A protein has these predicted regions:
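Short beta-rich binding modules
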Residues: 1-123
Length: 123
């Protein structure tokens, strides 16, 4: 199992794709999601609940445009959104955190920088 992350309330842990980690205090007057998007240089965020196994409210904000996708239609009612090309470097640490909460055998990787914060700190 991977080393769990520890994040203080009212802070954002940024994990860069190169492996560096930085803790940034949340700014008053700036929504935490907006601050996270700026910190990880993302136009659109997606959130992964990574604290479920430890019973915390930690969420990981990832760049929703970090992958190029294709839509595969299996039948009239079943479509698949398939990642085909990374637009940013693989973030090994974020991928490990993601795989810890996924079903065994998951191979999808997290790309680019990520921001981790407490969901309760996001209004």
């Amino acid at each position: 199992m991977t080393r769990a992350v520890s994040v203080e309330h009212k802070t954002i842990l940024v994990i860069r794709a190169d492996g560096t980690e930085t803790v940034v205090p949340m700014l008053r007057g700036t929504p935490p999601t907006e601050q996270a998007a700026l910190l990880i240089r993302a136009d659109m965020l997606d959130f992964v609940r990574i604290g479920l196994l430890e019973g915390t409210d930690l969420v990981m904000a990832v760049d929703d445009n970090g992958w190029e996708y294709e839509v595969v239609q299996h039948n009239e009612q079943h479509f698949e959104h398939r990642a085909i090309k990374a637009r940013k470097p693989i973030n090994q640490r974020a991928t490990e955190l993601y795989h810890e909460i996924c079903k065994p055998g998951t191979t999808h990787q997290i790309v680019g920088d990520v921001a981790i914060m407490h969901d309760g700190d996001v209004p």
